[in-house]
Amino acid sequence: VNIAQGIQIIDGANTGTIDVNVDDSAGAILSELTEVSGGTNLDELTSLTVTAGVVDISSAADLQDITSYDASNSSYTISDTAGAILGDTGTVIDDGVSTINVNGPVGAGVGVQLGALEDASFETGYSADINFNVVDDANDITAALTGDTTGLDNAASLVASSGTVTVTEASDIQGVAEYDSGASSYTISDSADAVLTASNESTILNDGVSGVVVTDATGAGYVDASDGEALSELEGLLQTATNDSAADIEFRVEDDAAAIAAVLSGNNGGALDGANDLEVTGGTTTMVGAADIQSSGAYDAANSSYTITDTAGAILGDTATAIDDDGVSHIIVDGKVG
């Protein structure tokens, strides 16, 4: 019978023992539940099965306190805040609770606790799934994953909303089962070696990575022209992966004129445009090499110093490159002139 019928049967009984088994929703049962001396008005039922419904922790505790409550045949949902759920785990871990919904997103640390609670529920032989979403700074997520990179695998979704982490830490975040790259946005900060290691490329080229800072190639640090070319290419791939033309790999390039010109030669003039700064630190190049250097979007003429060596005809044919550039410190004319 349902709860209303069960109440009528109990109220109408005058003598003897009557077996009354009630099956009804949580809401219907709670609407009839009242406290009486020594218990509740539903304790006289032979059995009480909660067949469905969504209740908060407090109401779930009220249901479970009814003497006739049949946990093994019940199935209902608890929906409440993370604090309420973690504050009364005894009510949560119950055979009759089929699902637990956590209201709103939670931080990474709370997510680990909720995941552990779900595991504990399964270990008791129950099968309640705790549905929760984690939204937190990448640094806090990394801290929560320290020592156990599976600590957030029970989350329904994981969003790294900001923050800066290393390549290894980013890999840990991306390894979480329900990591949501499309909703994430954070920065990777690491050495050029780490960023350019082939096995790390998939971690760098992730939709959730908004940018990369090459730690030993910023400030006074730098990479050479060859690594600069590789980083520029990686930046283009990152922009494609994230569908964001503003996605940036931050790095500086310093090298001699010959090395830079070699990277920029032919149709490769934009090979170092991904650099935030390109400084020529000496060396010698031809007029063509100098023109390639000066055409780079990252070229820093004011802080460069190099020599052009070429024929008189080549030099006189492009005086803007030879004379009008702050980075050209010397010009050497090859051969004799008339």
What are these regions (language model features)?
Residues V1-G338:
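Solvent-exposed, low-complexity segments and loops of surface/extracellular structural proteins
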